[in-house]
Amino acid sequence: MSLIDIQNLTIKNTSEKSLIKGIDLKIFSQQINALIGESGAGKSLIAKALLEYLPFDLSCTYDSYQFDGENVSRLSQYYGHTIGYISQNYAESFNDHTKLGKQLTAIYRKHYKGSKEEALSKVDKALSWVNLQSKDILNKYSFQLSGGQLERVYIASVLVLEPKLIIADEPVASLDALNGNQVMDLLQHIVLEHGQTLFIITHNLSHVLKYCQYIYVLKEGQIIERGNINHFKYEHLHPYTERLIKYRTQLKRDYYD
């Protein structure tokens, strides 16, 4: 079953040039779905379109848009409590002059009415999902944590609202290989053990082949290949996909990616 189903998504600039060219996209429930492609292919544009975060000089159209089986015209109403977003800029998500416990409980209470005790309970649960303990985090400031720890706290700040869908745009791009793999292990655990749905935009082929169940390949604004992981391991692939998998290099990113 798909959590998001969008048909004929097109994104244009003010000159009416199509940057995303009529793609059909399904994000399957309780799976890690991936979108991969070269620099400038438009990967992050798709994520921004789903969340209505497109720059003002770009516009999008589509024939139909469903979320959790219901027709929708805007997803902004779901952002935060039903749809979470993880970016690579985790260090900018917390200020340096407020303890993390206060910031995390404020995130929960912004979306849900509840007592401080209830918020702390939700924060404690979210931190446990990313293998952190409240006693080690709540009384600290962001600058006191390592990059890997802060990334986990950032993920916990999304999980505290218990969203059905998490959109992750290059979530480990700014981490070293070891911390990046640890974070991907955590995201996989969250999907498998807690029933979350993940849509990840990444240029890391190794992560895609190791962690993802369903994959889209984007080239010049068009999806040229799609399928489950077995398709990409055992089937005859598009020459472009073959080249990506052959080299398995981390593809460069630009302004739009």
Swiss-Prot record:
Its EC number is 7.2.2.11. Keywords: ATP-binding, Cell membrane, Ion transport, Membrane, Nickel, Nickel transport, Nucleotide-binding, Translocase, Transport. InterPro entries: AAA+_ATPase (IPR003593), ABC_Ni/Peptide_Import (IPR050388), ABC_transporter-like_ATP-bd (IPR003439), P-loop_NTPase (IPR027417). One of its GO terms (cellular component) is plasma membrane. Residues 4-245 form the ABC transporter domain. ATP binds at residues 37-44. It catalyses: Ni(2+)(out) + ATP + H2O = Ni(2+)(in) + ADP + phosphate + H(+). It is a peripheral membrane protein. It is an enzyme of class 7 (translocase). It is found in: Cell membrane. One of its GO terms (molecular function) is ATP hydrolysis activity. The keyword Secreted does not apply. SUPFAM superfamilies: P-loop containing nucleoside triphosphate hydrolases. The complex is composed of two ATP-binding proteins (NikD and NikE), two transmembrane proteins (NikB and NikC) and a solute-binding protein (NikA). Belongs to the ABC transporter superfamily. Part of the ABC transporter complex NikABCDE (Opp2) involved in nickel import. Probably responsible for energy coupling to the transport system. This is Nickel import system ATP-binding protein NikD. It comes from Staphylococcus aureus (strain MW2). The lineage of its organism: Bacteria, Bacillati, Bacillota, Bacilli, Bacillales. The gene is nikD.
